[in-house]
Amino acid sequence: VITGAGGVLGGSIAKCFMQQGAKVVAVDIRQEQLDKRVEELKTYGEDVIGIVGNVLDIASLEKLADDIVAKWGRIDILLNIAGGNMPGATLAPDQHFYDMDISCWEKVTNLNMNGTVYPSLVFSKVMAKQGKGCIVNVSSMAAYSAITRVPGYSAAKTAVANFTQWLASELALKYGDGI
């Protein structure tokens, strides 16, 4: 399962998986980009499904997980790639942090942080039942070195990096090396 598969990074990773013979579920909120990506991926094999999905909607993620298990019997890998910045969330060179539109901050931090946490929550349950699986969360260099003028994005990617460390140790305590 690859979230953000309609984008450049998600699409490139999906392509690599397809080239290795993996079954891929490409998830993206943008229908048109997802459709184009799935058509491109089908040149590498037929085991690809495109699902329009919202990584911030737990109920739809649960349905997605159930549908995948019903079709293929298991979920081996979750790649949390969905995320990004948005217009209005980037400060202009002459703009101060206190001038930022708080609604942009909330949208960017919600997408980048919870867009990783929610799929991890849902798919880790499936992997726990299986006794194994792999969750890969994509953060950014912004997590380790603040990028000028993108405070929400930088803060959220720092949260993703820390959440990833926490989740790995939490799952290791319960499942060993299985997840």
Task: Locate the predicted segments by residue.
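Canonical Rossmann dinucleotide-binding motif of NAD(H)/NADP(H)-dependent dehydrogenases/reductases
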Residues: 1-25
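Conserved glycine-rich Rossmann-like NAD(P)H-binding loop of the short-chain dehydrogenase/reductase
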Residues: 20-36
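The beta1-alpha1 cofactor-binding region of Rossmann-like NAD(H)/NADP(H)-dependent oxidoreductases
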Residues: 31-32, 52-64, 102
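Conserved mid-core segment of classical short-chain dehydrogenase/reductases
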Residues: 62, 85-106, 129, 149-152
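Alpha-helical segment proximal to the catalytic Tyr-Lys
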Residues: 125, 169-173
